[in-house]
Amino acid sequence: TERSRLFAAPSAPDSVAAWLRRYLEALKVRHANPINLAARRSQLARFNAWCVDAGIATPAEVTHAQLERFQRHLYYARKPNGEPYALNGQASVLANLQAFFRWMVRHQHLPSNPAADLDLPRTPSRLLREPLSLTEVEAVLALPDLAEPYGLRDRAILELFYATGIRRQELANLKVADIDTERGCLLVRQGKGRK
């Protein structure tokens, strides 16, 4: 996208883009999850594009008031289909900015963190209020067409989710060798938080 190209373009050593690239490199060196790193890169590229439009050249020029304006920009921004961005996405962008500015202060590149007291949007709880009933579980497990190969695959995926409670990315990372049929166990190589 245009935003990503702008982020990757050559820039002055003290520019927002240059510092964001250094920050992402520091995360990469610390073995950050590649999927999370890609998401952070996209979100920080969005902030960089906003800084370019706002005439903010360096991180030292960023103030708390400007970050509040960026937060309002996120709130009023629309997807290509005209829908607003989800609150969880807005909160994630702002949390990544807080982490970036915290890193800048920790490594003595800035004297203070302009994002320190930024109020993040309240996001609704995503947990189920109550677990699915046995009837509901059976109805979900009966959805795949077991006469089709994709149906068998989908049923196995649903069974794994239900029986183990693993996360979507953990399931996507599973290999056949991670299944111990003798003991009835799964080896989850990389769970949330690198666990």
List where the protein language model places each region.
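Conserved catalytic core of the tyrosine transesterase superfamily
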Residues: 1-195
